[in-house]
Regions:
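Carbohydrate-active catalytic/glycan-binding domains of CAZyme proteins
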Residues: 1-202
Length: 202
């Protein structure tokens, strides 16, 4: 098991979002072990953060957000056969962004994670915003104002023959997405106290 997190560079005249760091986690000891190492520095978009790491079909897939949660927000994918080799960034640019679509109803898309269903369908949940526009302002800059703040969106995800992920309908995403097929609701039983009076020793 591994923990991935953003590595912050405190040095002057260096971009603070240095890259994504990985540290091994021991489930038996319930603690991190060994020394951390940087596995991915992102692209020249910078602001590389929000990592999610998956082991799928012989690859380690790393999903990261870039650009910050603003209109330049985007999600990129990278992969490697080993955590100790260089990660290859998915060719063709970010697989989710609305930076190039100022009139799209979904904006600021990025920063998400994978979901797979029992029937083998794949989805990608992500942050987004739905801006409202003022008639006296440009619809390009600013693109509008998002009174609901950071919202959660979901997109259907497909894998190409080379094993790279793509958003169904294109990298801008869709406003409406078909629900998964044959998925039954799963109700989780609470596994923690509903109330805690914080009167214990710890």
């Amino acid at each position: 098991k591994y923990l991935v997190n953003q590595y912050w560079d405190p040095r002057s005249f260096h971009h603070p979002f240095y890259g994504i760091m990985c540290t091994e986690y021991s489930a038996a000891e319930e603690q991190l072990v060994g020394e951390p190492w940087v596995i991915y520095k992102g692209t020249d978009d910078r602001f590389t953060e929000g990592p999610h790491l998956y082991k799928l079909n012989g690859y380690y897939y790393l999903f990261v957000a870039q650009g910050g949660t603003v209109y330049a927000h985007k999600e990129r994918a990278a992969r490697a056969k080993s955590l100790y080799e260089e990660f290859e960034t998915q060719p063709g640019g970010p697989f989710l962004t609305t930076l190039d679509a100022p009139y799209h109803p979904i904006q600021k898309a990025g920063h998400g994670s994978l979901v797979d269903t029992p029937d083998g369908e794949w989805y990608f949940t992500h942050l987004m915003g739905r801006p409202l526009h003022r008639s006296q302002e440009s619809s390009i800059d600013p693109r509008g104002w998002c009174p609901l703040g950071r919202e959660t969106g979901i997109q259907k995800l497909i894998w190409d023959e080379d094993g790279w992920p793509h958003i169904a309908g294109g990298h801008n995403g869709l406003l409406e997405v078909d629900a998964p097929l044959n998925v039954k609701e799963h109700k989780w039983e609470p596994d923690c106290p509903v109330k805690d009076d914080f009167d214990g020793d710890r």
